[in-house]
Design a protein with these regions (language model features):
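Boundary regions of SH3-family modules and the immediately adjacent low-complexity/disordered segments
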Residues: 1, 15, 29, 36-37, ...
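Aromatic- and glycine-rich peptidoglycan recognition patches
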Residues: 2, 68, 152-188
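Structural motif
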Residues: 28, 134-135
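Beta-loop motif signature
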Residues: 3-32, 85
Length: 188
């Protein structure tokens, strides 16, 4: 396994103008598939395929790349209030809804999938009346989450959004199109 030296965008194609698929954080493991013309085809730890600049590969071996700095994911997510929304983003420079969930759990030393639909699949359904702070609220139709947020209780959520004039990480009253609530259960 390889890693990267710094925050590195993962692109859909080996060209500067290509769509950003996600980001790789320093220390996260990546699998190198091939290098070509200064680009490296990789797979991320979350099984995202894509391309990064070959010069970004290096740094310390990934070893223990999960952090354990916060007691719970909501506490970490609140440190990102006001951060701008960025599709595929996972840092203070910009973050999307599933990136917020992913990084918030990572800050507690727990690894969860990267995408909203994968995060939904990893959770156990919970009735709204039984929901606890930190459970995941899913939104979308067609049987798959297109958006995800943290439940705060009393009809409030914390999420990263770019909807109705809101841009970034905010706490707000949940929108009416709630699809479900999920609880992630971790075994020791």
């Amino acid at each position: 396994m390889e890693t990267v030296r710094e925050l590195t965008p993962v692109l859909a194609e080996p060209e500067e103008a290509a769509e950003r698929v996600t980001e790789v954080l320093p220390g996260e493991p990546i699998r190198l598939i091939e290098t070509r013309d200064g680009w490296a085809e990789i797979r991320t730890a979350y099984d995202y395929p894509g391309w990064i600049k070959a010069g970004a590969i290096g740094g310390k071996p990934h070893g223990e790349w999960l952090e354990n700095r916060f007691p719970d994911p909501v506490t970490y997510a609140r440190t990102l209030l006001g951060t701008s929304y960025l599709w595929g983003g996972m840092t203070e420079a910009g973050i999307d809804c599933s990136g917020l969930v992913h990084m918030s759990f990572r800050a507690t030393g727990r690894l969860v999938p990267r995408d909203a639909d994968q995060q939904e699949d990893a959770g156990t359904p919970v009735d709204e009346g039984d929901a606890r702070v930190g459970d995941l609220v899913t939104y979308g139709d067609g049987g798959s989450a297109g958006h995800i947020a943290f439940w705060l209780g009393a009809g409030r959520i914390l999420h990263s959004t770019q909807r109705d004039g809101t841009d970034g990480v905010v706490e707000e009253t949940e929108p009416p199109e709630l699809a479900g609530i999920r609880r992630l259960i971790f075994r020791l």
